[in-house]
Structure formats: structure tokens, C-alpha cells
UniProtKB/Swiss-Prot annotation:
Induction info: Increased expression in vivo during human sepsis. Highly expressed under biofilm conditions after 24 hours of growth.
Protein name: Immunodominant staphylococcal antigen B
Family per similarity comment: Belongs to the IsaB family.
Position of the signal peptide: 1-36
Chain ranges passing through the membrane: none
Organism this protein belongs to: Staphylococcus aureus (strain NCTC 8325 / PS 47)
Compartments it resides in: Secreted
Record key words, sorted: Secreted, Signal
GO CC terms of this entry: extracellular region
Amino acid sequence: MNKTSKVCVAATLALGTLIGVTVVENSAPTSKQAQAAITPYYTYNGYIGNNANFILDKNFINAIKYDNVKFNGIKLAKTNTIKKVEKYDQTFKGVSAKGNEASQLQFVVKNNISLKDIQKAYGKDLKKENGKTKEADSGIFYYQNAKKTLGIWFVVDHNRVVEVTVGHTPYKTSK
């Protein structure tokens, strides 16, 4: 019987250890740390070429709303200069003396982005500038969350986006 009791005790200890029954007392108070809010941003590096689909990306649109967009190391911000710089296939206008900020960026769109694509991405906030063209599928369309923030302007020719400018007003297109 002594042998049987030893086996039972050993089995009970082994099973208890295996299952890992432990009681943890939660006496220490938990503290909640505040999370810092992260401002949406968008950074693009390199040639845009046939890869302008980022203009339809919700992260890009949100970064425009929060005035936090950077292309090839140049942050789009209000500047009071007239310096113009060509970088890759983009034209930066109003470039600061240090070359790290510009008021506007222009680039040609070489792939097929349609007016319907930008209308879907920007929704009811996309407006048409009243200009020379009376055609519904041509003209300058723009999105700007508020007058003092970044905006984006699309030159549309027969339902096809051909040029984009991102920056602060006053806006000037090359078309």
C-alpha cells in the first residue's frame, strides 16, 4: 500500500505542475500611459513617372488634410520665396533657402488616372474650378480641407488626369 500511495502522490504533484495551477494576486495598481497622437504624414521618394496612383491613397489624402506631406526630402509648407527646383520628374516652387521646404510641387501624370478615380477617392470634397472649359470631364479640380492648409489640384483633360499640383494657394498650373 505504501508503494501505491507514493505513486498517487507523485502523479498528483506531476499533474499539478503540468497544469501549472498558480494564483497570482493582482494587488499592484495598474497605470495607464497616455499615447501621443501621431499626426498623419506621407513621404514619397524617387520618380513619380507612371506611378502616380498614390494620389488616390487615403493615407496621402489624410496627410494633405493635416498639412504633412514630403517629397524627396522636401516638405510642402508655406514659404515666401520664388526659387524653383527640378528634382527627379517633379518641379518644386517656392523652395526655401535651405532647400528642405517648398510651397508647391507639380508633376505630370503619365498613367491612366481618370476623373472618376479622383472623384471616388476625394468624394464630395472634390470641387471643380470655374474656368475656361465648359466640358464636364475637363478642367481643374481641387481638394483643400481649409484655406490655410495644403491643397491638391488636378488638371483633367477629357476624363484623364494629366497634371497634379500639391501645395498652398495661390495655385498656378502650367496648363
